[in-house]
Amino acid sequence: MRTKLSTCNVWFPLLVLLVWNPARLVLANIQEDEAKNNITIFTRILDRLLDGYDNRLRPGLGDSITEVFTNIYVTSFGPVSDTDMEYTIDVFFRQKWKDERLKFKGPMNILRLNNSMASKIWTPDTFFHNGKKSVAHNMTMPNKLLRIQDDGTLLYTMRLTVQAECPMHLEDFPMDAHSCPLKFGSYAYTTSEVTYIWTYNPSDSVQVAPDGSRLNQYDLLGQSIGKETIKSSTGEYTVMTAHFHLKRKIGYFVIQTYLPCIMTVILSQVSFWLNRESVPARTVFGVTTVLTMTTLSISARNSLPKVAYATAMDWFIAVCYAFVFSALIEFATVNYFTKRGWAWDGKSVVNDKKKEKGSVMIQNNAYAVAVANYAPNLSKDPVLSTISKSATTPEPNKKPENKPAEAKKTFNSVSKIDRMSRIVFPVLFGTFNLVYWATYLNREPVLGVSP
């Protein structure tokens, strides 16, 4: 018995291997045959779909309007150019429509195809109305996707990079907000032939990737969608519009423009505290601050398009320029009255000297006339001549000469204009800043959105 059991234990695994290996080979062959059959079925379905198919004709020609459902997924938004008034956007652009000619029956419900099939069927002639430049990505192969359902519904997706126009109104710059549109529609088909419809609700038809913002100077507040019809000489066309709402960040401009302007105005007001006789110092303050404001105003305009109206920053710079220039005019006024005071002291001293010289000359002339009149009589009368000699011998007592008063080098007191300016200028400039920032920072952004 033991011998028989050991013999069975040896032969049983061999029998299992002999039976399993052929079965496994048969299953593999069956699966391979099924794969070949599927490939053959796919090929036959595609050949049958394209047999007699004319991609020059739209679906439902002569019977119904072709409805194209669209949605957009934004992978990258930005940058935005203020000078060119344009922005760059990278999207997955998706379109879905139904073509009865592409219905099929088979073991699968969806045919997943690449871009080679897209060139053999009809696709919408969609273009971007406000696009300056559009690029379809082709590395390493054209980035296109095509799916055909058994009921003839097609999904066509492509990756695009679009440079589009973004009209900007810069009256509130740099506290401004903008709505950049992306408009697209059919180039050749009117509303009676092809119409566009958003696939989902407004919040889902246009989506932006969480890390898709490429903006340094803006915040992307959100997006909205719309639809409109435009008329032209060739008919009416459907235009789909997606608006991207942007709010400018003010931090860069505060550091680069606003703070330097404020510091320049404060520096110009330091001259009110200098002595009004310090002409060189106050002149340097005034001229330097005026030139600095001129440079700041020029540099602030370099980052903006050449618009014909004044922006909020222009108004701020203009007021700062007015304060700086007024400080220079204030010094000129103070200096003018200071010069008149010094000139008056000098004239009074000169006039006193002239009066003293005139009185001395008058006394000398009177004495000379008296001597000339009595000279002949003295020579005839010996008594008078003796008296005259005795009278002329002693020298008259000289009166001590009064030294002319020297010009007093007095220092002018603080000008009343300077005293007033020390209070008026800072108060006015502070009030202006309060009104300016309260007005623009609390203003709701106005976004121009077309219907």
From Swiss-Prot:
Alphabetized GO MF terms: benzodiazepine receptor activity; GABA-A receptor activity; GABA-gated chloride ion channel activity; ligand-gated monoatomic ion channel activity involved in regulation of presynaptic membrane potential; transmitter-gated monoatomic ion channel activity involved in regulation of postsynaptic membrane potential
Extracellular side: 29-249, 442-451
GO cellular component terms, A-Z: axon; chloride channel complex; dendrite; dendrite membrane; GABA-A receptor complex; GABA-ergic synapse; inhibitory synapse; neuronal cell body
NCBIfam families assigned to the protein according to its UniProt record, in alphabetical order: LIC
Keywords of this entry: Cell membrane, Cell projection, Chloride, Chloride channel, Cytoplasmic vesicle, Disulfide bond, Glycoprotein, Ion channel, Ion transport, Ligand-gated ion channel, Membrane, Postsynaptic cell membrane, Receptor, Signal, Synapse, Transmembrane, Transmembrane helix, Transport
Glycosylation sites: 38, 114, 138
Keyword Ion transport belongs to the record: yes
Highest taxon of the lineage: Eukaryota
Function field: Alpha subunit of the heteropentameric ligand-gated chloride channel gated by gamma-aminobutyric acid (GABA), a major inhibitory neurotransmitter in the brain. GABA-gated chloride channels, also named GABA(A) receptors (GABAAR), consist of five subunits arranged around a central pore and contain GABA active binding site(s) located at the alpha and beta subunit interface(s). When activated by GABA, GABAARs selectively allow the flow of chloride anions across the cell membrane down their electrochemical gradient.
GO biological process, one term: chloride transmembrane transport
Tagged with keyword Ion transport: yes
Domain notes from UniProt: The extracellular domain contributes to synaptic contact formation.
Subunit structure: Heteropentamer, formed by a combination of alpha (GABRA1-6), beta (GABRB1-3), gamma (GABRG1-3), delta (GABRD), epsilon (GABRE), rho (GABRR1-3), pi (GABRP) and theta (GABRQ) subunits, each subunit exhibiting distinct physiological and pharmacological properties. Binds UBQLN1. Interacts with KIF21B. Interacts with LHFPL4. Interacts with SHISA7; interaction leads to the regulation of GABA(A) receptor trafficking, channel deactivation kinetics and pharmacology.
S-S bridge residues: 166-180
Expressing tissues: Expressed in brain (at protein level).
InterPro entries, A to Z: GABAA/Glycine_rcpt, GABAAa_rcpt, GABBAa2_rcpt, Gabra-1-6_TM, Neur_chan_lig-bd, Neur_chan_lig-bd_sf, Neur_channel, Neuro-gated_channel_TM_sf
Post-translational modification summary for this protein: Glycosylated.
This protein's name: Gamma-aminobutyric acid receptor subunit alpha-2
Transmembrane segment boundaries: 250-270, 281-300, 312-332, 421-441
Biased segments, Basic and acidic residues type: 396-408
Organism field: Rattus norvegicus (Rat)
Stored Pfam families: Neur_chan_LBD (PF02931), Neur_chan_memb (PF02932)
Signal peptide start and end residues: 1-28
Binding, 4-aminobutanoate: 94, 157
